[in-house]
Design a protein with these regions (language model features):
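Short, glycine/polar-rich helix-capping loops at beta-to-alpha or helix-loop-helix junctions
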Residues: 189-198
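Metal-dependent phosphoesterase signature
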Residues: 56-98
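Substrate-recognition element of Asp-dependent hydrolases with the DxDx(T/V) motif
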Residues: 26, 93-123
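Short acidic-hydrophobic, aromatic-tinged amphipathic segments that line or gate anion-handling sites
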Residues: 204-208
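Substrate-recognition "cap/lid" segment bordering the active-site pocket of phosphatases
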Residues: 85-86, 114-165, 171-180, 194-195
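Active-site neighborhood of HAD-like aspartate-dependent phosphohydrolases
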Residues: 2-45, 56
Length: 215
């Protein structure tokens, strides 16, 4: 039996393999402006800090700010219509979430993805998760690694901080958990590998979602 009762999950690279759709939308936006496209492995390195940072890393250096905003808007529009063309839960995730729900464990998703995309993907793939919080700087909720999204998730769930664990796949997630005062479980099926995670302070790592049930 797990020692945790509340689970705060990252989305991309933790619950969902979104890399193909992110790469497709990034390259679509780049293509519309005649810019070089990137491999999926390139995009894997770009993700983790929200779509603005993804596209800042994807566009050619020195791009004028006004044109960058056009590229970003093109990405956002395309992605909202193609967010689950190839996106799927990682193997073992649906079964693990089902068991956590059966046990009565409160769950939430916090992401640096756009709020609308975060909520749409969670509603589509994980209706058992009642709280999904995405990037929402306009509402005063700073993106990760600031603790704001986690704090808001705990507030909406109505749970105490000491009951919760944060689950994610990146260095941003490790920092987010630390800033929020939560233990962090780092997953090895996502966008970052074991050496990278250990280098960035990971202390608890798992290789399959079912391990969450007895960690």
């Amino acid at each position: 039996m797990s020692k945790y009762t509340t689970y705060i999950f990252d989305l991309d690279g933790t619950l969902l393999d979104t890399l193909g759709d992110l790469a497709a939308s990034a390259n679509y936006a780049l293509r519309q402006f005649g810019f070089p496209e990137h491999s999926t492995d390139d995009v894997r390195r770009f993700v983790g800090n929200g779509v603005r940072r993804l596209m800042e890393r994807a566009v050619p250096p020195g791009l004028a700010p006004a044109q960058f905003e056009e590229v970003l808007a093109t990405f956002r529009q395309h992605y909202m219509h193609h967010a689950h063309d190839t996106t799927r839960p990682y193997p073992g995730i649906p079964e693990t979430l089902h068991e956590l729900r059966r046990r009565g464990c409160p769950m939430a998703v916090v992401s640096n993805k756009m709020m609308a995309a975060t909520q749409e993907l969670v509603a589509h793939f994980f209706p058992e998760i009642p709280v999904a919080i995405g990037e929402n700087e306009a509402e005063g909720i700073s993106r990760k690694p600031a603790p704001d999204t986690v704090n808001e998730a705990l507030r909406r769930l109505g749970v105490e901080r000491h009951t919760a664990v944060y689950v994610g796949d990146s260095d941003v997630d490790i920092l987010t958990a630390r800033n929020a005062g939560l233990p962090c479980i780092s997953v090895l099926w996502g966008f970052r590998d074991r050496p990278f995670l250990l280098q960035h302070g990971a202390t608890q790592l798992i290789t399959h979602p079912v391990e969450l049930l007895s960690f």
